[in-house]
Amino acid sequence: MLSRRLIPCLDVRDGRVVKGVKFRDHVDMGDIVELALRYRDHGADELVFYDIGASPRGRSVDYRWVERVARLIDIPFCVAGGIGQVETARAVLHAGADKISINSPALRQPALISALAEAFGVQCVVVGIDSIREADGQWRVRCNTGDPDKTQALPLRTLDWIVEAQRLGAGEIVLNCMDSDGVRCGYDIAQLSQARALCQVPLVASGGAGNMQHFADVFHKADVDGALAASVFHSGAILIPGLKQFLREQQIEVRDV
């Protein structure tokens, strides 16, 4: 069995790391490079950087901080935000990122997934999906979630989009469960389990981590390949070395720190 991945998520706005609750009310958490170095030293398996202002503002990710991070860390990292064309993705990868993630641009232009997979290989292409449960009980996709004033509700069912994104060439899916985001009440096991049944590529859970047991639960019950978290890591409520030891005690395979 492959080792499960622990992935700190760093939401970036105006060159700083921020964190919100249910994608709103963001507060400053610190410098990008300082946090990246801390997580590298603590044994994170990978980092994900979301430039949350890029897509809502119609701009591409700021390559300068990508280059800064790439010069200083030696663990894989993925960059998301405003990557709406192949050349933008090429520039991000050239700046040092290992993978690129697309979310809102893929919803506007699904063929972008295929174009990126053809240009760089599916292993470089992550599709992020922001999902929320609506009144009828269905999970549906949200677009432009980096700015609450520009967030759009789409009729597209989350599970349908997971299937379609894979067909188009996604090499990994990150499912951001918005109802759970930032509230630390646990990952959305029900939604992630249904996604897992449809997902033939690596699936990463996002949204809801509040304690170590939540990580064990999402690996055991939803069988995800990776667990992404932000606030519990940024605040120091959970330290990665201790979390890895806890997971090993739960018979979950993780890489050494």
UniProtKB/Swiss-Prot annotation:
One of its GO terms (molecular function) is lyase activity. Keywords: Amino-acid biosynthesis, Cytoplasm, Histidine biosynthesis, Lyase. It is found in: Cytoplasm. Its main location: cytoplasm. It holds the Pfam family His_biosynth. It is an enzyme of class 4 (lyase). Pathway: Amino-acid biosynthesis; L-histidine biosynthesis; L-histidine from 5-phospho-alpha-D-ribose 1-diphosphate: step 5/9. InterPro entries: Aldolase_TIM, His_biosynth, HisF, IGPS_HisA/HisF, RibuloseP-bd_barrel. The active site is at 11, 130. GO terms for biological process: L-histidine biosynthetic process. GO terms for cellular component: cytoplasm. It catalyses: 5-[(5-phospho-1-deoxy-D-ribulos-1-ylimino)methylamino]-1-(5-phospho-beta-D-ribosyl)imidazole-4-carboxamide + L-glutamine = D-erythro-1-(imidazol-4-yl)glycerol 3-phosphate + 5-amino-1-(5-phospho-beta-D-ribosyl)imidazole-4-carboxamide + L-glutamate + H(+). Its EC number is 4.3.2.10. PANTHER family: IMIDAZOLE GLYCEROL PHOSPHATE SYNTHASE HISHF, IMIDAZOLE GLYCEROL PHOSPHATE SYNTHASE SUBUNIT HISF/H IGP SYNTHASE SUBUNIT HISF/H. NCBIfam families: hisF. IGPS catalyzes the conversion of PRFAR and glutamine to IGP, AICAR and glutamate. The HisF subunit catalyzes the cyclization activity that produces IGP and AICAR from PRFAR using the ammonia provided by the HisH subunit. Heterodimer of HisH and HisF. Belongs to the HisA/HisF family. This is Imidazole glycerol phosphate synthase subunit HisF. It comes from Xylella fastidiosa (strain 9a5c). The gene is hisF.
